């Protein structure tokens, strides 16, 4: 148990990071503002304006107000008298959260750099391909098709804002910074505006997203801290029963000794009791724990996680938030794809002497499809079509030039084909392409006050050739030597390593 406590004990090497003075520096808010401009680039639409009211004059006024206040107590009965943001409460709170998020990320960056060797630090930017969303799907394709059961876990949300503050106390040793964070959360935010549990995932306020994503990721990191330890223990004790290890964690030394005795006496490897392979994936407030083990083992994992989160985080967590599903019968929305493991039947004819017989084999295959109904819902929400999938014009773009309208529609179509290049079936993409193409034509016809047929007859069909060659252009750049068999390549699944965020239309949740 001492080893467990030592492992779960946080690193104390970053205990002298005094971050509170940085909050009163003007350049911190400028860096946070520039970081937000570079990060909030939309694929569907241009950035409507990160914060046009940002200026150093507002920053100076904010810092002056912060200097003049006393934050050593939180007034619960008379909160109106303790307000220091004044009339621009929303603007100032957003600026504080951006600056604070930028400051508290410094210890994490220092910890990452110190953990890397000098060689890895020089080549840290060369590993950007691993950040691609598509890099996850080959991993699932190679590993999940051989597993049996999966735990579908809805990550528990903190029932109190103080839990979010306590998760940072191991990383940020500056008490003043933690006190300001606690004051900010309790004074200007409540739990309903921070995290809502009505949806399958978590929805954050559109303002201060970086700040709350940082708090949420820190909290999830604490929730997942046990997986690393248990995985290391299972790898170290490969010849022990991992189920028994979970139930009798106090006696793992005795179990290890018992394995040595069995191995010495029988001279065999106890392969029957080896830990089945476990794979863990987290996405959008959910997590998946897949295993090759039995239903009984997955049920033990379920109750173990519930008890751990209840005791460690004081959460009211019930077993209904964790579901055990068989992979062959499980289908889920994952990163905009509809992913499932299905049985692909195949028949083999075998002949032995004069007798011949047929052998039916069922091979598990990881399948990825485009969810057509949610995607049409996203297009309808963006005013490209109705909820039934009928294309409509986009009046807000009617004031733009014809070439710019075509370029926008073509860019959206190319991005969708690029993002869904790993789909097993491409027919859905052609329906989406038809909707966007006709929506573009109706937008242009609305601009010129004409019908679609009359406009296309007057302008020529080559006006919309942007949509005819969108996916072929992407593939010709990727596979320049495969032009002869381009159709066969296009029908296969292709995973790209340059996709770092979910497409706006694919992120329908």
Swiss-Prot record:
It is found in: Plastid, Chloroplast. InterPro entries: Domain_X, Maturase_MatK, Maturase_MatK_N. Coiled coil: none annotated. GO terms for molecular function: RNA binding. It comes from the Eukaryota. GO terms for biological process: mRNA processing; RNA splicing; tRNA processing. Keywords: Chloroplast, mRNA processing, Plastid, RNA-binding, tRNA processing. The keyword Nucleotide-binding does not apply. GO terms for cellular component: chloroplast. Its main location: plastid. HAMAP family: MatK. Usually encoded in the trnK tRNA gene intron. Probably assists in splicing its own and other chloroplast group II introns. Belongs to the intron maturase 2 family. MatK subfamily. This is Maturase K. It comes from Nicotiana otophora (Tobacco). The lineage of its organism: Eukaryota, Viridiplantae, Streptophyta, Embryophyta, Tracheophyta.
């Amino acid at each position: 148990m001492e080893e467990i406590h030592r492992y779960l004990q946080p690193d104390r090497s970053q205990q002298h990071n005094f971050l509170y003075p940085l909050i009163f520096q003007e350049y911190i808010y400028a860096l946070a503002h520039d970081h937000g401009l570079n990060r909030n680039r939309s694929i569907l639409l241009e950035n409507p304006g990160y914060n046009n009211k940002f200026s150093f004059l507002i920053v100076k006024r904010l810092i002056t107000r912060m200097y003049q206040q006393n934050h050593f107590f939180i007034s619960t009965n008379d909160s109106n008298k303790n307000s220091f943001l004044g009339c621009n409460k929303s603007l100032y709170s957003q600026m504080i959260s951006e600056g604070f998020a930028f400051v508290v990320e410094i210890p994490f960056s220092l910890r990452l750099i110190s953990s890397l060797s000098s060689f890895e630090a020089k080549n840290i930017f060369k590993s950007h391909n691993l950040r691609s969303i598509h890099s996850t799907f080959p991993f699932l394709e190679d590993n999940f098709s051989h597993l049996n059961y999966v735990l579908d876990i809805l990550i528990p949300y903190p029932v109190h804002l103080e839990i979010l503050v306590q998760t940072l106390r191991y990383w940020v040793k500056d008490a003043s910074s933690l006190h300001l964070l606690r004051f900010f959360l309790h004074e200007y935010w409540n739990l309903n505006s921070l995290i809502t549990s009505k949806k399958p995932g978590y929805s954050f306020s559109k303002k201060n997203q970086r700040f709350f994503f940082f708090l949420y990721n820190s909290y999830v990191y604490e929730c997942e801290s046990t997986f690393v330890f248990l995985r290391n223990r299972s790898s170290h004790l490969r010849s022990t029963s991992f189920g028994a290890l979970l139930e009798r964690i106090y006696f793992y030394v005795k179990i290890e000794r018992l394995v040595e005795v069995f191995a010495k006496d029988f001279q065999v490897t106890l392969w029957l009791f080896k830990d089945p392979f476990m794979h863990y994936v987290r996405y959008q407030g959910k997590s998946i724990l897949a295993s090759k083990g039995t239903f009984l083992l997955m049920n033990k994992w379920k109750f173990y996680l519930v008890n751990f989160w209840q005791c460690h985080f004081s959460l009211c967590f019930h077993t209904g938030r964790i579901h055990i599903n068989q992979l062959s019968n499980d289908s889920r929305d994952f990163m905009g794809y509809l992913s499932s493991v299905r049985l692909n039947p195949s028949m083999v004819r075998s002949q032995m002497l004069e007798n011949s017989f047929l052998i039916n084999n069922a091979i598990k295959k990881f399948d990825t499809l485009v969810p057509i109904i949610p995607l049409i819902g996203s297009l309808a929400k963006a005013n490209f079509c109705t909820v039934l999938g009928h294309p409509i014009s986009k009046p807000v773009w009617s004031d733009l030039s014809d070439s710019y309208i075509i370029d926008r529609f073509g860019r959206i179509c190319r991005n969708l084909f690029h993002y869904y290049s790993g789909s097993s079936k491409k027919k859905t993409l052609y329906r989406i392409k038809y909707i966007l193409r006709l929506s573009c034509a109706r937008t242009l016809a609305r601009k010129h006050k004409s019908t679609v047929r009359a406009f296309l007859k007057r302008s020529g069909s080559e006006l919309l050739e942007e949509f005819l060659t969108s996916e072929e252009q992407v593939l010709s750049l990727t596979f320049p030597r495969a032009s002869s068999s381009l159709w066969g390549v296009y029908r296969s699944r292709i995973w790209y390593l340059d996709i770092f965020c979910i497409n706006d239309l694919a992120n329908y949740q």
